[in-house]
Amino acid sequence: PSPAKEVARFHQSLPNYAITPLIELPEVARELGIGRLFVKDESARMNLSAFKILGAAWAVAQALTDGANPADIAEVKAAIDSENKPTLIAATDGNHGRAVAHMAKRLGLECAIVIPDGVSEQAINNIAGEGAEITLIDGDYDEAVELAKEITATLDHAIHVQDMSWPGYEQIPNWIIEGYTTLCAETDEQLRELGKHISRCTVVEIEEHTSELQSPEA
């Protein structure tokens, strides 16, 4: 199977997986003077209110299986050394940390999340609700990432699952990006089901953690 198909197959093995709605907004498209406008509604993705679980889940699965492209979550669980279970570490300002913590809970792993100043109480509670150990800092996101690096270095068995890269740390961020291909694959299939060819489209992430697809032609 193609990489995107392997990613989608894995996501389909996760509890609560379902294709999220693609909603057409014809009146808004007319107001904007474009052919067609679609909103990919990620507000109910796996009951986590954001698409970030797609990237975090695949990155965690790949990290735990040494990049074996696991077919399902059972294969990931089987790869975990019960005597040396790793701790998942991440810095976050919201949904990424919750997604990493959710995967840790699903896999029976400990999780430590570093949260910078300015994150809402609701977001913090959501992450804590997934069972993560929370560290709040009086600093910005970059400082949170640095502390997450330090925490990872102090532990014998830890995996830093960060959605940004730096020299020497590229593989996990790349896996996170691969995870998002499921969203694109779903959208492609949903557009095909409309029965009309979309010759060109633009993808825009908007604040409510959805993706907007706009096509210049009908």
What residues fall within each predicted segment?
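PLP-dependent amino-acid enzyme catalytic core
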Residues: 1-211, 215
